[in-house]
């Protein structure tokens, strides 16, 4: 993952008399080493953690000071309950923390708290709140699939020859050690009725960069996809399709291939910033993030007016949605189709990098808490899209077709043939 460097800082410190001040913390990495013995101490500490380390305070509408005033007394009641009966049901703790953080906009966030004194019949002794699990089902185009989404699209692609003429269809699974996950790939070279070709790529995660470095089966498949784009004569190349439906995210370096392969010069694609200090609004400056022309693959699809269609849906998350957003923002022939995406656009760093700044994942559930939250705030096309997601150029909803994946792909081919 690329390192992002800033050269200046913006400092804004805000305090109020309606709640206890967030104590200065030397760096947020220390937060994982603190201890507490009561529910109020636990709450007080976690409130300070998010006051310091949450990166979206400039756009999140949660009134964090009012939340302290409202919920601190409720945690005092839990302490009294423990003193009276010797335990606190985990469901009661979950209800309070869901009300506290459930409406936050960070769609990467996972907020876990251990119940210090669970009831004897509690099945678990901790609660986990993920704001996106509460927000996503409220969208009017939400479609509840009967199975895991990435499997659904793989089954669909395995039967693609029954819908379209296919000249090449390669699929494989490769392991990306940097992600600690396996990635499933499908490369298809479609043939249109007029004989022209459309290279297509679907991957379950954004892992082109680490897989290319390994030079295994995944790298071979990816090379075939990019070679088809680079080497097919213009009169035979109808367009390009990148399918990011059900793509759960991964490496931002993949943009070096997915955008850089089509650039002639260094290009800014977004800006990022992070929490530089303990103050709630103590950010670094917005730092441009540039993509350079790819030295391995290159074709000027803008000059040749080659359509570049990117499919995305509600299950396009993190890099899975940043890719269609930035491709559309940078490349004039790009066109996006599908659904408004998940809304988790804040880049992340591993927990072992947390001491480099004041935001991101921290803690250990075995010692009381674990908070997984975005390290960086991203601004694309002048806007922070966290908790909102990206709305594509052309809306085609799976819900309108009982979950069928084909109409979105049909729309991609229709656009390519019309342009």
Give the residues covered by each predicted segment.
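Gly/Ser/Thr-rich loop/hinge elements
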Residues: 249-307, 349, 355, 368, ...
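Flexible, low-complexity junctional segments that flank or bridge functional domains
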Residues: 17-270, 355-357
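Bacterial Sec-dependent N-terminal signal peptides
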Residues: 1-25
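Non-catalytic, well-ordered alpha-helical segments in soluble enzyme domains
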Residues: 320-332
């Amino acid at each position: 993952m690329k390192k992002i460097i800033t050269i200046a800082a913006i400092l804004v410190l805000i305090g109020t008399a309606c709640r206890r001040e967030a104590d200065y913390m030397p760096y947020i990495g220390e937060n994982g080493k603190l201890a507490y013995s009561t529910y109020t101490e636990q709450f007080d500490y976690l409130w300070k953690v998010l006051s310091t380390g949450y990166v979206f305070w400039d756009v999140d509408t949660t009134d964090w000071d009012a939340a302290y005033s409202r919920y601190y007394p409720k945690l005092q009641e839990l302490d009294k309950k423990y003193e009276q009966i010797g335990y606190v049901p985990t469901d009661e703790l979950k209800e309070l923390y869901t009300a506290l953080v459930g409406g936050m906009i960070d769609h990467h966030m996972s907020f876990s708290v251990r119940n210090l004194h669970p009831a004897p019949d509690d099945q678990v002794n901790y609660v986990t709140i993920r704001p996106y699990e509460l927000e996503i089902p409220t969208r009017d185009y939400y479609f509840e699939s009967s199975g895991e989404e990435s499997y659904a699209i793989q089954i669909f692609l395995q039967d693609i020859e029954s819908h379209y003429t296919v000249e090449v269809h390669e699929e494989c699974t490769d392991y990306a050690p940097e992600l600690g996950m396996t990635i499933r790939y499908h490369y298809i070279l479609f043939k249109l009725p007029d004989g022209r070709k459309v290279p297509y790529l679907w991957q379950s995660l954004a892992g082109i960069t680490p897989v290319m470095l390994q030079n295994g089966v995944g790298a071979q498949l990816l090379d075939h996809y990019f070679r088809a784009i680079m080497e097919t004569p213009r009169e035979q190349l109808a367009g390009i399709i990148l399918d990011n439906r059900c793509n759960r995210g991964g490496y931002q370096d993949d943009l070096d291939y997915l955008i850089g392969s089509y650039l002639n010069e260094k290009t800014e694609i977004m800006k990022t910033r992070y929490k530089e200090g303990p103050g709630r609004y103590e950010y670094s400056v917005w730092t441009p993030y540039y993509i350079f022309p790819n030295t391995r693959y290159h074709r000027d699809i803008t000059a040749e007016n080659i359509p570049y269609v990117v499919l995305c849906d509600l299950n396009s998350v993190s890099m899975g949605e940043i890719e269609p957003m930035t491709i559309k923002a940078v490349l004039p022939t790009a066109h996006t189709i599908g659904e408004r995406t998940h809304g988790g656009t804040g880049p992340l760093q591993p927990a072992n990098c947390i001491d480099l700044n004041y935001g991101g994942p921290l803690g250990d559930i075995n010692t009381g808490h674990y908070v997984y939250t975005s390290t960086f705030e991203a601004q694309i096309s002048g806007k922070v899209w966290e908790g909102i997601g990206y709305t594509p150029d052309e809306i085609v909803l799976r819900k309108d077709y009982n979950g069928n994946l084909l109409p979105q792909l049909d729309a991609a081919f229709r656009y390519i043939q019309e342009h």
